Amino acid sequence: MAATLFVTCVTAVHADCLTDAQAAELLAHYVARTPAPNPVNLSDADGACTRGKFNQLLAQRMGKVVGYKAGLTNPAVQKRFNTDKPVWGKLYEGMVLPSGASVEAAFGARALYEADMLVRVKSAAINQAKTPEEVLDAIDQVIPFIELPDLMVQAPPQLNGAGVTAINVGARLGVAGTPLPVPVYRGERYALLKALADMNVSLTDGAGARLGGGKGSDILEHPLNAVVWLAGALQKEGITLQPGDLVSLGSFSALLPPKAGLSVTATYDGLPGAAPVRVTFK
């Protein structure tokens, strides 16, 4: 009797995976760009289950998966969401726009922007990568990227890691710059590896005023560690990275709200050959 009562009490404060109807409601809010109710008290398993249902519905609408995003890879951002580990979501066709794109400031219900970076997978060996060096061997491009996530719920500050997972880590849009090819020669590759950790990433407005930024090593001590983590997390759910997939590494900056008329440029100082990437909000 006491045991039964205990189980009842525990489950009363613990939410479950969103129902199919709730997942459909989440999609309706996503499409309408209106804030959805916050998922409450989700466990990590509930968050993953909800992400699966939400992505099934997103795929019917958005089409092909073009890659994945690792989120909460920066300890400062983890702290904001009261968690100590990264999360992941799927990127769909049409989400990645070219540098210079003009985007509505209200592109989502809870629109934000951040300094990020993409890499492109060259080889399935990436799924066994355990170090940044091994990741570099399995990618062929490093791409400057301003991500435009949408936290899409009524009260984003109340989201925890599982809640962020449930909403597909806020994947909505992003603006990609000119790809930087990964060099062939060993010495140049080593220099690139070091530059990725040491680079200073800055966000500036149209007048050149600094909006935010951070260092390469702010992401899991080396940004390519985000790929090591992501590959392992995906494999736990039976997914492997494939050649051509894009991977978003996470945020080098705080998440900032856009406003109409603002132009934002991300620069990667200390990363030779990396051109700035720009987005304008209308």
Question: What is each PLM-predicted segment?
Answer:
Residues 253-256, 270-273:
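Short, charged beta-turn/beta-strand-edge "cap" motif at the junction between a beta-strand
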Residues 1-9:
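Bacterial N-terminal signal peptides
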Residues 10-15:
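Sec/Tat signal peptide C-region and signal peptidase I cleavage site
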